[in-house]
Amino acid sequence: MAGKTVTRADLSEAVYHQVGLSRTESAALVETVLSEICSCLASGETVKLSSFGSFVVRSKGKRVGRNPKTGVEVAIEPRQVMVFKPSNVLKAKINGLNGAGEHDDD
């Protein structure tokens, strides 16, 4: 799956091949997991997936921004933002390192 955008359908297909559930069950499983993550984040909870990372909802306060074209100040209202913080394991995997901080010889 490298080099492209992975969709829900791609995740469902991967579950189908690797776990052995039917395509319908695989799609339902992926949908349920994503729905649960969304529900938790919408209620302000942190979602932590071991060896993957954490999804955290943070509050941003009111501030003054500026229109880059006109220079006019614009009030930016307080809001909630979602932040993803990858685990060290995921960072190492992305950078081609194994758990000991050494490059894999693939």
Swiss-Prot record:
UniProt-listed SUPFAM superfamilies: IHF-like DNA-binding proteins (SSF47729)
Entries under SMART domains matching the protein: BHL
Entry's Gene Ontology BP terms: DNA recombination; positive regulation of metabolic process; regulation of DNA-templated transcription; regulation of translation
Domain of life of the native organism: Bacteria
One GO CC term on file: cytosol
CDD domains in the record: IHF_A
Annotated TM spans: none
Keyword list, A-Z: DNA recombination, DNA-binding, Transcription, Transcription regulation, Translation regulation
Pfam families, A to Z: Bac_DNA_binding (PF00216)
Gene3D superfamilies: IHF-like DNA-binding proteins
Record GO terms (molecular function): DNA binding; structural constituent of chromatin
Family: Belongs to the bacterial histone-like protein family.
Assembly mode: Heterodimer of an alpha and a beta chain.
Function: This protein is one of the two subunits of integration host factor, a specific DNA-binding protein that functions in genetic recombination as well as in transcriptional and translational control.
This protein's name: Integration host factor subunit alpha
Originating organism: Methylobacterium radiotolerans (strain ATCC 27329 / DSM 1819 / JCM 2831 / NBRC 15690 / NCIMB 10815 / 0-1)
